[in-house]
Curated annotation (Swiss-Prot):
CDD domains in the record: Ribosomal_L1 (cd00403)
Assigned keywords, A-Z: Repressor, Ribonucleoprotein, Ribosomal protein, RNA-binding, rRNA-binding, Translation regulation, tRNA-binding
Gene behind this protein: rplA
GO molecular-function terms, A-Z: rRNA binding; structural constituent of ribosome; tRNA binding
Source species taxonomy: Bacteria, Pseudomonadati, Pseudomonadota, Alphaproteobacteria, Rhodobacterales
Family assignment from sequence similarity: Belongs to the universal ribosomal protein uL1 family.
Complexes and interactors: Part of the 50S ribosomal subunit.
Name of this protein: Large ribosomal subunit protein uL1
Organism: Cereibacter sphaeroides (strain ATCC 17025 / ATH 2.4.3) (Rhodobacter sphaeroides)
InterPro entries: Ribosom_uL1_bac-type (IPR005878), Ribosomal_uL1 (IPR002143), Ribosomal_uL1-like (IPR023674), Ribosomal_uL1/biogenesis (IPR028364), Ribosomal_uL1_3-a/b-sand (IPR016095), Ribosomal_uL1_CS (IPR023673)
Signal peptide bounds: none
Length: 232
């Protein structure tokens, strides 16, 4: 335990006095302080000037990171017939209809992304209370209710990240592994922040992007200069 404590303390000391730094400096600091025995994820937290309790201030979307996430994404697809075959050929991990619904209802959820063809939504809709809170409910706004199941599976496995604002006006996402090259992590951060900026809802008033922080899975966070966090 003492060893872990020293490591954590050393990591935190490296962050003292570091605030509103560039993305590159933040990434370098986080990579240098990462000390977990596994390949940690670089995580972005964005504080937005929205109140998601109002429908016209909801922020959600999807972005394909230029350098991927480094994460193995397990994909489930609700489809029948030719579309089910298409999903399997594209590399979906689980494909089904009523059988998949029953598996999920039993509490067995072994996937990170759920895709459905439009005709399957009446069936999938019964799972709203299970999938909704886990942010797994297929949604046409983020391309997971589609007839192009092969494309959706490919995107999910190829570095696509979904985002949705939480009650406090915060968006969290993993944008790569600490083992990634620093430049690639910086590119991913900016791609994600740009996507959230583009998703600014019509009802947002005042300052939209308030704060951007970066951290590793186990490490402390550091605030990033907002101008540095965007690519333009």
């Amino acid at each position: 335990m003492a060893k872990v404590g020293k490591r954590t303390r050393a990591a935190r000391e490296a962050f003292v006095g570091k605030d509103m730094v560039s993305v590159e400096d933040a990434v370098a600091l986080i990579k240098g302080a990462a000390s977990a025995k596994f390949d940690e994820t670089l995580e972005v937290a964005m504080n937005l000037g929205v109140d998601p309790r109002h429908a016209d201030q909801m922020v959600r979307g999807v972005v394909t990171l230029p350098n991927g996430t480094g994460k193995t994404v397990r994909v489930a697809v609700f489809a029948r017939g030719a579309k089910a075959d298409e999903a399997k050929a594209a590399g979906a991990d689980i494909v089904g209809a009523e059988d998949l619904m029953e598996t999920i209802q039993s509490g067995k959820i072994e996937f990170d992304r759920c895709i459905a063809t439009p005709d399957m939504m009446p069936l999938v809709g019964r799972l709203g209370k299970i999938l909704g809170p886990r942010n797994l409910m297929p949604n046409p706004k983020v391309g997971t209710v589609t007839m192009d199941v092969a494309g959706a599976v490919g995107n999910a496995k190829g570095g696509e990240v979904q985002f949705k604002v939480e009650k406090a006006g915060v968006i969290h996402a993993g944008v790569g592994k600490i083992s990634f090259d620093a430049e690639k992590l910086a590119q991913n951060v900016r791609a994600f922040v740009d996507a959230v900026n583009r998703a600014k809802p019509a009802g947002a008033k005042g300052t939209y992007l308030k704060k951007v922080s970066l951290s590793s899975t186990m490490g402390p966070g550091v605030s990033v200069d907002l101008a540095s966090a965007t690519s333009h």
